[in-house]
Swiss-Prot record:
EC number: 3.6.4.13
One Gene Ontology term from the biological process aspect of the record: RNA catabolic process
Family the UniProt entry places it in: Belongs to the DEAD box helicase family. RhlB subfamily.
Gene behind this protein: rhlB
The protein's role, per its UniProt record: DEAD-box RNA helicase involved in RNA degradation. Has RNA-dependent ATPase activity and unwinds double-stranded RNA.
Motif, DEAD box: chain positions: 165-168
Protein name as catalogued: ATP-dependent RNA helicase RhlB
Gene source species: Salmonella arizonae (strain ATCC BAA-731 / CDC346-86 / RSK2980)
Keyword Hydrolase attached: yes
Length: 421
């Protein structure tokens, strides 16, 4: 982890429970990020927090640290039953829930607090078995949480801490009714520590905070610019016919260590995957159609470096923290300006630098003015020589539902650069 994004504030400076500090230091966490330095004094004083920070700024560890400290410092309610968790962390996607659970495990190992995971797609009985033995902190998506609650596998009457992560995305995905259903089954807001984190604190997110929290304090960490000053942005104007060849040429030129390619539809993602897999790249596909176990396996392979390129839709990739992403390619300019910020926020994280390359084709170039207005600057334009684009491309593979991760290639060096001046 780069230290350039850290503050002088140390976790040990706070009156944190000693086991929490021990767990953090075992993971090499000594200094706070800005959002952690702002949020922790409030949560340690028992104040509710609604936090906004750019992606990759340590929001997850801010609310996990607060949650573990609170549970260790406050007794559970009298006569708490085995099906009553003490803390509930809600996430918009199953991948994000799994990721939060993984980030919480080192804290759980030191403190002895038990974790549970609840998400749709698969693993129903496996997740239920863990819940039946009793958990302190339950992390999950709203649909599976409601399912378990309706069947009385969980009871929310003993909740002491609530976290809502990626609250803006909860709205985008239509989960607000589910969230309100869950809140109605908990003790009143004044009897809980409530935390909400979001990439944007829009009016609707603030309305939710007012409705479900107890006089929340708003904390914001604004970047120098919405897209992050460590991210180099670049824009090309390809024709529809040259777009795929330009992408593959750029990949050969840049030879990224770890890249994510975004497209606006799952069908476009599948097409990109097919071209890159046929050309021998180690590439994975992350869309809503990919089975849950494969999604988790592909994410793990990409995180470990067994895959070099991940092709993804916005919904599938939102909220995921994958370290050391060097490049983001916007094969399609997104229809939503905020999605542009979220996409390129996959790179340039935690003090590192990154490179974002966008292709403004005939189909999606109309999205560019709104994006540039939203981020507050023009994206630098680069030109390319159409005659220098790759032509020796194999026929794309057709996706088989058994393997959306492919390719042995990662030997040798990149080919000569093909851009015009």
């Amino acid at each position: 982890m780069s230290k350039t994004h850290l503050t002088e504030q140390k976790f040990s400076d706070f009156a944190l429970h000693p086991q929490v500090v021990e767990a953090l230091e075992k993971k090499g966490f000594y200094n706070c990020t800005p959002i952690q330095a702002l949020a922790l004094p409030l949560t340690l004083a028992g104040r509710d927090v609604a936090g906004q920070a750019q992606t990759g700024t340590g929001k997850t560890m801010a609310f996990l640290t607060s949650t573990f400290h609170y549970l260790l410092s406050h007794p559970a309610i009298d006569d708490r039953k085995v099906n009553q968790p003490r803390a509930l962390i809600m996430a918009p996607t199953r991948e994000l829930a799994v990721q939060i659970h993984a980030d919480a495990e080192p804290l759980a190992q030191v403190t002895g607090l038990k974790l549970g995971l609840a998400y749709g797609g698969d693993g129903y009985d496996k997740q239920l078995k863990v819940l039946e033995s009793g958990v302190d902190i339950l992390i999950g998506t709203t649909g599976r949480l409601i399912d378990y609650a309706k069947q009385n596998h969980i009871n929310l009457g003993a909740i002491q801490v609530v976290v809502l992560d990626e609250a803006d995305r909860m709205y985008d995905l239509g989960f607000i009714k589910d969230i309100r259903w869950l809140f109605r089954r908990m003790p009143p807001a004044a009897q809980r520590l409530n935390m909400l984190f979001s990439a944007t604190l829009s009016y609707r997110v603030r309305e939710l905070a007012f409705e479900q929290m107890n006089n929340a304090e708003y904390v914001e960490v604004e970047p120098e610019q919405k897209t992050g000053h460590r991210i180099k942005e670049e824009l090309f104007y390809p024709s529809n016919e040259e777009k795929m060849r330009l992408l593959q040429t750029l990949i050969e030129e840049e030879w990224p260590d770890r890249a994510i390619i975004f497209a606006n539809t799952k069908h476009r993602c599948e097409d990109i995957w097919g071209h890159l897999a046929a050309d021998g790249h180690r590439v994975g596909l992350l869309t809503g159609d990919v089975a849950q176990k494969k999604r988790l396996r592909i994410l793990d392979e990409f995180t470990r470096g067994d895959l070099d390129i991940l092709v993804a839709t916005d919904v599938a990739a939102r909220g995921l923290h994958i370290p050391a992403v060097t490049h983001v390619f916007n094969y399609d300019l997104p229809d939503d300006c905020e999605d542009y910020v979220h996409r390129i926020g996959r790179t340039g994280r935690a003090g590192a630098s990154g490179h974002s390359i966008s292709l403004a084709c005939e189909e999606y170039a109309l999205n560019l003015p709104a994006i540039e207005s939203y981020i507050g600057h023009s994206i630098p334009v680069s030109k390319y020589n159409p005659e220098a684009l790759m032509t020796d491309l194999p026929k794309p593979l057709r996706l088989t539902r058994s393997r959306p991760g492919n390719g042995p290639r990662r030997a040798g060096a990149p080919r000569n650069r093909r851009r015009s001046g």
